[in-house]
Amino acid sequence: MSDDKKDEEKLKKSDENFDDDSKYYEFDDTIKKVFEEEKAKEEDEDEEEIPQEKEGYQVKSQLLETEQNGLQPADLAKVMKSSFIEYAMSVIVSRALPDARDGLKPVHRRILYGMSELGMFHTAPHKKSARIVGDVLGKYHPHGDSSVYEAMVRMAQDFSLRYPLIDGHGNFGSIDGDEAAAMRYTEARMSKIAGVMVDGIKKNTVDFIDNYDGTEKEPTVLPSRFPNLLVSGTSGIAVGMATNIPPHNLGEIIDAVCALAKNPEITIDGLMEFVLAPDFPTGATIFNKAGLIEAYKTGRGSITMRAKANIQELANGKSKIIITEIPYEVKKTEIMEKIADHLKNKRIEGISDFRDESNRDGIRVVIDVKKNAVPEVILNTLYKLTRLQTNFSFNMIALVNGEPKLLNLKECLQVYLDHQIDVTRRRLQFDLEKDLARAHILEGLKICVENIDRVIEIIKKSKTDVDAQAKLCQTFSLSEIQAKAIVDMRLGRLTGLAIEKMNDELDQVNARIAEYRAILSSHEKLIELIIKELQEVKEAYGDKRRSEIRWDVMSSINNEDLIPQKEIVITLSSNNYIKRIDLEEYREQRRGGVGVSTVKTYQDDDIQDVVVANTHADLLIFTDEAKIYRVRGHEIPSGTKQSKGTPIVNIVPTIQKNEKVVKIICVTDYEESQSLITVTERGVIKKTNLKEYELIRKNGKYALSLLEDDHLIDVRVVDQDEEIFIAASNSRINRFNVADVREMGRVARGVGGIRLSDDDKVVSVSSSKDGAYIFSLGAKGYGKLSLVESYRKTKRNAKGVITLNEDKAGKLVYAAAVHGVEDLIIMTQSGIAIRISLRDINVIGRNAKGVKIINLKGRSDQIVGVAKIYDEDATDRELTKEEYIEVTKEIDIDLANE
């Protein structure tokens, strides 16, 4: 056996022997008992550490049924209930809710009273905020210093209070959400208007109570010579309730209090003639009158606050949104961060840059809008997605007689008015008693002066002051106070001038006493005094409203509501580039003018279609594959005369690459009496009720079924009693009744409208409602204006009659019925546009060759599009005598030939 194995055997044997305590050790009974108890205790502790199932736990408790060692039995549920109620009432009464009389919470009241006791009025120098906070903490407010300083900071912020009660010196925070500097760095004093809050507090106008340790006295309420609850507003969260009262304009609230004082029966509607709406320190715009009326009548309601912004148009076609005022209690940095987040997440598009240019003069947030974006839409989106527009919810709860109460507007004003009646009466009573005491002394001094020799004799013979006072009282029937005043009087008061002043003072004091008694004995005079004093406060501190009231604004508006209705020109290129230009940018030119460039042409891209529309109208976009899409006029990006435009796929993402837009029509109203006429290149016509196209969306639908070798070429909205004119490239126009075409479903194929040869195609469609004349224009710039009656009526699917000499005018590019007074915009392939008036074109016969309408730039240039500027009030022009002779002669010849 190896040495290692021997060692293992010895170790094993020793362990076995060690486990058998009785074999090697002998304990006496006492020691053994101690070890057994310790071992049992350790086993119990080990068992407690072992986790057990819930069922294994047994909670042992001992109920205390009688008083033991100073402990009294109590029901836990009752103790919890009473303790919570005490805590809740403490929060409600002593911390979170304001008193309806002065509009202050205890901490604000203690700050103002403490500062007034320190003499820190607006005329005194500023003192360290830490000194003020320490004084308030030590004497009145046994809570944390942060709560006192935060309340003090808020009262100094001109963006938190409409009329700040603290005049702060140093960093007291900002509207960006920056915190105030530590109280060891800032200084403060009472603002001028805060002095009005404590005015008269030394005249027993309010009740005082002991402070928390009984060493000081503090007021239960401040005199408050203006209605601070509504003027400054307040907010706070108590237990089971909260308050939220907005600030108001001082002048409006004082006028309402005066109106209530004059007419206690005035209604809330009557009071709202004075109190127009809240007036926030940050300005902004207020709307939602229904919510305001509800708030003033019930104490609960909501209004909407919206930032003030204006749109600035720039010379390069871009624009800026400039925000100058933001809603109440909204941090400017929060708005900036939200805008940045939405731009990053692409919830807001069309903004190229934004920045904060705010300074001491006020808020200025500048948002740069991209060239093709609509600033009104972007601004509305910002209102929806950021706190540039937010609601203020009224919850006008305040303490009335120490109990929380929901107040309406009249009740708020009534509580304050009752408080002022009490304060004013107590002040007058105090002044009356003070003047009575002064008059009493002056009357004693007057008796002294009238009997000066006798008084001096009595005083000289008296051994002490007390003896002199007693003899004076006995001799002249004076009171102790009068006698003491005589004894204490200096000899200088006996001069003639001093005696005269004393008599004048007595007269003045007696006059004031009479006035005080008259006011105190008459409720009407007391009310007049209160109104007078309130008006003095208004004149001293009143100012204009900061928040604008707009009851005509909806709280939730569509983007389109922000876009002005304007007449626009929509241009479409052959490569599906589209843009809109204000109609006003096209100036009228005389016939034969060269025109102005309206689009920068690119290789293989020419102007195809021109539509005069409205920003609030529907644009039905038809493609050659007979698909139809719908967009609004303002959704087409704005461009300049020289800009290329925007690919239409950016506006209608579902449009296919192989689709080519062939027609855009403007629809303002989907009337059931109207029909939509579609005409294909091969002369197929279809009539469908216009209502079937009302629900078309951007994803598109089919307008009709096409043959394989056919494409949609033109679309027209018509009434049932109209005549239709289909013009073909072979210079023929087919005139027939709309009623000849039966109404079909949206996806039907249609019937023949005009008979064509293989090389010909339809170029345009018009109707008799458009006027009594037909204007025809060829690709070479020649055209003419003729009477509709010059074109004989045929039938559907006929060849039609000739309108232009093709050799001279070229292929027909446009032929439509007109009144003869409209303006036309003519587009050339080279991108030139000219605006002409049909008034400048003489009416000639159908068989005439035509006149030069536009001078083209080079032989390769030709006319590709014509748009008529519609005038709803337009009527057919009257023929001149010469025109009448010519056209009627031709009509007679045509009739004779038939």
UniProtKB/Swiss-Prot annotation:
Q: Where in the cell is it found?
A: Cytoplasm
Q: Which residues form the active site?
A: 185 (o-(5'-phospho-dna)-tyrosine intermediate)
Stated role:
A type II topoisomerase that negatively supercoils closed circular double-stranded (ds) DNA in an ATP-dependent manner to modulate DNA topology and maintain chromosomes in an underwound state. Negative supercoiling favors strand separation, and DNA replication, transcription, recombination and repair, all of which involve strand separation. Also able to catalyze the interconversion of other topological isomers of dsDNA rings, including catenanes and knotted rings. Type II topoisomerases break and join 2 DNA strands simultaneously in an ATP-dependent manner.
Q: Which InterPro entries match?
A: GyrA, GyrA/parC_rep, Gyrase/topoIV_suA_C, Topo_IIA-like_dom_sf, Topo_IIA_A/C_ab, Topo_IIA_A_a_sf, Topo_IIA_dom_A, Type_II_DNA_Topoisomerases
Q: Say if the entry is tagged with keyword Nucleotide-binding.
A: yes
Q: Which HAMAP family does the UniProt record give?
A: GyrA
Q: Which UniProt keywords apply?
A: ATP-binding, Cytoplasm, DNA-binding, Isomerase, Nucleotide-binding, Topoisomerase
Instruction: Give the EC number(s) listed in the UniProt record.
Output: 5.6.2.2
Any one GO BP annotation for this protein: DNA topological change
Q: Which residues form the Topo IIA-type catalytic domain?
A: 97-562
Q: Which PROSITE patterns does the entry link to?
A: TOPO_IIA (PS52040)
Claim: Acyltransferase is one of the keywords in the record: no
The record's misc note reads: Few gyrases are as efficient as E.coli at forming negative supercoils. Not all organisms have 2 type II topoisomerases; in organisms with a single type II topoisomerase this enzyme also has to decatenate newly replicated chromosomes.
Q: Give the reaction(s) catalysed.
A: ATP-dependent breakage, passage and rejoining of double-stranded DNA
Grouped into one coarse class, the protein's main location is cytoplasm
- Motif segment (GyrA-box): 589-595
Give the family this protein belongs to, as stated in its UniProt record: Belongs to the type II topoisomerase GyrA/ParC subunit family.
SMART domains named in the record: TOP4c
- Kindly list the GO CC terms recorded for this protein: chromosome; cytoplasm; DNA topoisomerase type II (double strand cut, ATP-hydrolyzing) complex
Protein's name according to its UniProt entry: DNA gyrase subunit A
Q: Which Pfam families match?
A: DNA_gyraseA_C, DNA_topoisoIV
